[in-house]
Amino acid sequence: MSSAAAATRFIKCVTVGDGAVGKTCMLICYTCNKFPTDYIPTVFDNFSANVSVDGSVVNLGLWDTAGQEDYSRLRPLSYRGADVFILSFSLISRASYENVQKKWMPELRRFAPGVPVVLVGTKLDLREDRAYLADHPASSIITTEQGEELRKLIGAVAYIECSSKTQRNIKAVFDTAIKVVLQPPRHKDVTRKKLQSSSNRPVRRYFCGSACFA
């Protein structure tokens, strides 16, 4: 598979969420299969990947946005034309969890009403790391049950927990986002189980643009 020109459809997927929750790490792990060791705050960036789904190829445009307040006026410019949002929070940060409902959903509803949202809890490895939690007493873990409750509260189509460091469920995050666009849920209250079952079909990736070639 050579280029985006071979794709039969373009899907714009935008990642949003508080700064430092791991949005960029998640994108880099998905496109490059590696975990970045240095933290560099994102302003705006994008990646492109040709993805083979059920025998047809779609061009997946991945848009990374900055969560800092300094970019609140510019960030919505990235929302135009979005097909799906990946809304992320850290599983060891209650503030980022609470901001999903207080900050991010109101912003998405204002600038991109009706666009489906996949809710993602990041840094799963740290939530399970007792040594890390002992060294960082200010951390406040979010349970899977709390994540599911938030998904229902905001009307997200799916909830997935992942770790960029271990790459656990990273592929599932983007597979689910793709399937949500290609196979929209018939009912708003679709279960995560149904989406994950659909996401189990083979998905192949061919990276281009500013993404790493894997």
UniProtKB/Swiss-Prot annotation:
Belongs to the small GTPase superfamily. Rho family. Changing residue 19 to V: Constitutively active. It comes from Oryza sativa subsp. japonica (Rice). One of its GO terms (molecular function) is enzyme binding. Small GTPase playing a general role in disease resistance signaling pathway. Acts downstream of heterotrimeric G protein alpha subunit. Regulates cell death and reactive oxygen species production, probably through NADPH oxidase. Also involved in sphingolipid elicitor (SE)-dependent defense signaling. Activates phytoalexin production and alters defense-related genes. Down-regulates metallothionein 2b, a reactive oxygen scavenger. May control lignin synthesis through regulation of both NADPH oxidase and CCR1 activities during defense responses. It is found in: Cytoplasm; Membrane. One of its GO terms (biological process) is regulation of cell shape. May be palmitoylated. NCBIfam families: small_GTP. May interact with MPK1/MAPK6. Binds to RBOHB, preferentially in the GTP-bound form. Interacts with CCR1 in a GTP-dependent manner. GTP binds at residues 17-25, 42, 64-68, 122-125, 164-165. Changing residue 24 to N: Constitutively inactive. It is a peripheral membrane protein. This is Rac-like GTP-binding protein 1. Gene3D superfamilies: P-loop containing nucleotide triphosphate hydrolases. InterPro entries: P-loop_NTPase, Small_GTP-bd, Small_GTPase, Small_GTPase_Rho.
